[in-house]
Amino acid sequence: MKRKPDIWSKNPDSEDLKAAGHYLSLIMAEHQFSSLITALRHAPTIMHDAKDLLRASQTHLLPKDNPHVAENLKRIKKGKKLSPVLLIRGNAPKGITLTIADGHHRICASWYWNEDEPVACRIVEFVKPHKPKA
């Protein structure tokens, strides 16, 4: 059986870190999301199965013809590597799901490319930082 090529780059693109910051700014205070972006920038890149990421985040597989999923599939077919997905670890005992800060479309494209393809990701813990003093 022919092995499919590695589709993941080791480091996230700067625009993906920026997009993660924009998303996180909608769900938490600036002093919280900025520390998470810094942590994501320096976190190691690890691999997780797409199906597990979708389950842990309680998100659904987007359709293959979704414009962003389709664009990522084109990139894969052209041999261009995808940026790792950026994640905030959930907390099951507290009912907090995994947060996909950036990369849901890449997870879905990876699944369509090869459902057994591990997804490159950077994952950090949410630790409530001290609020800066005014």
Predicted regions: what they are:
Residues M1-N66:
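An acidic, glycine-rich, mixed-charge low-complexity segment common to nucleic-acid enzymes
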Residues K2-D16, L82-A134:
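A short, basic-hydrophobic beta/loop patch
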Residues L40-T99, W111:
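Short alpha-helix boundary/capping and kink motifs at helix termini
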